[in-house]
Amino acid sequence: MRISMMAETSPLERRVPAERPLSPHLQIYRPMLTMMMSIVHRLTGFANYFGTLLLAWWLIAAASPNGYAKFQWFASSWIGRLILFGYTWSVIHHMLGGIRHLIWDTGRGFGPKEREWLVAANLVGSIAITVVLWIFIILTTGVG
């Protein structure tokens, strides 16, 4: 009986890589509106968590005149209004995106034209509703 001094190769070491295509990488995709709006939908969902802190601050500030005065000072500053405007758009955009996803859950709107129309309607609708809402707020409250 002869003992070989050479180490045997394991089945993993003898394995030959399979000849199959690799998944395409994100860098080869041309950005599409649906892809961008999917990312924006996730970002607005994330931003809504932080915007809800503003809502909590407003509710907590209502407990004292001094606290409410501080919130009013922030909300009436240009940066406060910009943040509130952005939060308004974020909530509306995320809501319309949720409606778009509900439509997709029914199995409708997956054709190329329908998909692009829904995404464009989501974007245009969220901007239009936000602007109309803020015009209404400015006209009815005299904030300007």
Can you name each region flagged by the protein language model?
Residues M1-G144:
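Membrane-embedded alpha-helical bundles that constitute the cytochrome b-like, heme-associated redox core
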